[in-house]
Amino acid sequence: MMQRVTTSMTTAAAQRNLQLGASRLAEAQERAASLDKLSRPSDDPTATGEALRIRNLQAANAQYQRNVDDGSSWLDTVDSTLSSTHDLLAKVRDLTVQGGNGALGPDARDALARQVEGLRADLLQTANTRFAGRSVLAGTSDAPAAFAADGTWSGVPGAAVTRRIGPDTAVRVDADGSAALGTGSDSVFRLLDDLAADLRSGVPVTGRLTQVDARMASVRAVQGDVGARHAQILRSKETLIDTSTRLEGQRAELEDLDLAAAVLDLKLQETSYQSALAVTAKVLQPTLMDFLR
């Protein structure tokens, strides 16, 4: 049985098509303005979920990059501190060699002792170098200085400052001050006190060279470990940059709309809407019978 198509049915269909065209045009305009494929989760629930997962990975990767930058700054400071420490000890060694000259008189030996004491003060200041409000040779200790005036180390044995640079990777960014400079009676500061006292009292100091050399070697050993950790962090930085680029590409593939494609779609929707307007205008034109009713 053939169904009769009335004017009202035709009009309603035309209006629905017009509304649909207007809705599609509005969506195309929104996409062209924002260049977002996913204006709302309902656009593509699966893609939206994947985009959120990638954004979470990007946030974590960005945090690792910040940790790498902070850790690198820590290790730069530690390395510089240890280099300065080694240089000061090299000067102490030179003074020790000079002090081994048996022909030196009391005044000359006293002058050398005063230089050793000056280097000790410089060494203490260097050993207490801070970064971001923390002593770089005191581990996790919140003490204001890594070493007290008497050479006692204020750090906590085995407690290290670390930075997480990956899901399963954390790197130590400080250095063990006691391993480099000793502590208390075994510290380099006590060694320099004894050296200055020996110089003043006329006690031969050549035997102190072995102790100075040993302490210089311990500083270099700690510095070598710092260098290895710094190299690890720099390698990690390159990996994180690559990961950032890859994740951004994945995110853009899911979320970002190509400008040319967006403009083309907008033009198509505008043309379609204009056609729908023209058709609807004809459908809604009053007929002769409308005027005769």
Regions found by a protein language model. Give the residues of each.
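Amphipathic alpha-helical polymerization modules
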Residues: 1-142, 197-293
